[in-house]
Amino acid sequence: MTSWPPRIVIRRSSGLRTMESALVRSGLGPVAGVDEAGRGACAGPLVVAACVLAPKPYPALARLDDSKKLTERTREELFPAITRLAVAWSVVSFPAEEVDRMGVHVANIEGMRRAVAGLSTTPGYVLTDGFRVPGLPAPSLPVIGGDAAAACIAAASVLAKVSRDRVMVAMDETHPGYGFAIHKGYNTPAHLTALEKLGPCPEHRRSWSNVAALIHRVDNSSGSAR
């Protein structure tokens, strides 16, 4: 009888495919990896991706790693390779307004559910990056630092990151002045300076403390001026 989660010896030094291979050998494949991009940003969408890779080596994906460790150019080069070679992949997005309404953690969990549900292949097991996701259609295991430990999570992290970055570059055209194409909505000094100067745009998350504080100051200033 298989225990849940199964007891597997994982040697991270053996490479990114070790975890999936162990699960597949235990009869638990196909294995899906899930990851997000934009959780900590104060502007733009939260994007979640799921990906299933076949349990075999892919020379075209040799550079696969945690998307945050890769250059933008490498991520862009890996993106079409992942979408071409993956058994299945799925990307879902929650706009800023929906993140505010749901809360970022709830949106993240729901995004992971939707991304897995959107796969064209039903996974036998799901690896998530960092925390438990209830309500998935298959047994799952949270993996701390999963995007650097499992290839399917690393692939999902690239899909989510590239998809979101492209949205932020386009957003820079519709909302100029904030530098979205550069900082991608994260709280960099340049972004915070632009936010103070221009005020929030519709793509800023009102539930974020720095955005909410700015709105509060503006409202108070407007009230005292009347």
From Swiss-Prot:
It comes from the Bacteria. GO terms for cellular component: cytoplasm; ribonuclease H2 complex. Keywords: Cytoplasm, Endonuclease, Hydrolase, Manganese, Metal-binding, Nuclease. Manganese or magnesium. Binds 1 divalent metal ion per monomer in the absence of substrate. May bind a second metal ion after substrate binding. Disulfide bonds: none annotated. CDD domains: RNase_HII_bacteria_HII_like. HAMAP family: RNase_HII_B. This is Ribonuclease HII.
